[in-house]
Amino acid sequence: MLEQAPAEVKQVIESGGVVAYPTEAVYGLGCDPDNDAAITKLLAIKKRPWEKGLILVASDYQQLLPYIDDSQLTEEQRERVFSKWPGPFTFIMPIKPGISNLLCGSFNSLAVRVSDHPTIQAICQQLGKPLVSTSANHSGEEPAMSHEEILAKFEGEIDALVAGSLGEQRKPSTIIDAISGKILR
């Protein structure tokens, strides 16, 4: 496994690799949202059932539009979302037809976040699209909080590590239903 800068990890992601990187609260694992083989690999590493779905993180709202059905949001709902972004708020949004079940799981919606974390911003800007994101842990275990923990837990399983500082959050992102405004976590 190779430690890489955000600008260097683009090739790993585009070739179907799974990468680890710091987020607002914990280290995350991610991959290309348009590569089902990469998503399957990520789910296998985490030992996570596909039915639970995953989160997409992006550097801006435009990157999410190929995946979410923005037309189902009212202007008021859109303004509520934009008032929280970029930041540690994940919104559940309606999906566009044809989105992989590996992303949305058994739901007809998708969890998405525009992150203000500089590493996520840099990776997504390099890719020109969002990144699948999930906490860096095997299901049922605590998430990794440092690049040393990543190396200890995932050596030989992931393809790259972007070391860096975690954000200021001490808990996972708040999850909000974009349509109803209900806080889910």
UniProtKB/Swiss-Prot annotation:
UniProt KW keywords? ATP-binding, Cytoplasm, Nucleotide-binding, Nucleotidyltransferase, Transferase, tRNA processing
The answer to whether the entry has keyword ATP-binding is yes
* GO MF terms, alphabetically ordered: ATP binding; double-stranded RNA binding; L-threonylcarbamoyladenylate synthase; tRNA binding
What are its GO biological-process terms?
A: regulation of translational fidelity; tRNA threonylcarbamoyladenosine modification
Q: Which domain of life is it from?
A: Bacteria
- Please state where this protein is localized: Cytoplasm
Residue span, YrdC-like domain: 3-185
Q: What is this protein called?
A: Threonylcarbamoyl-AMP synthase
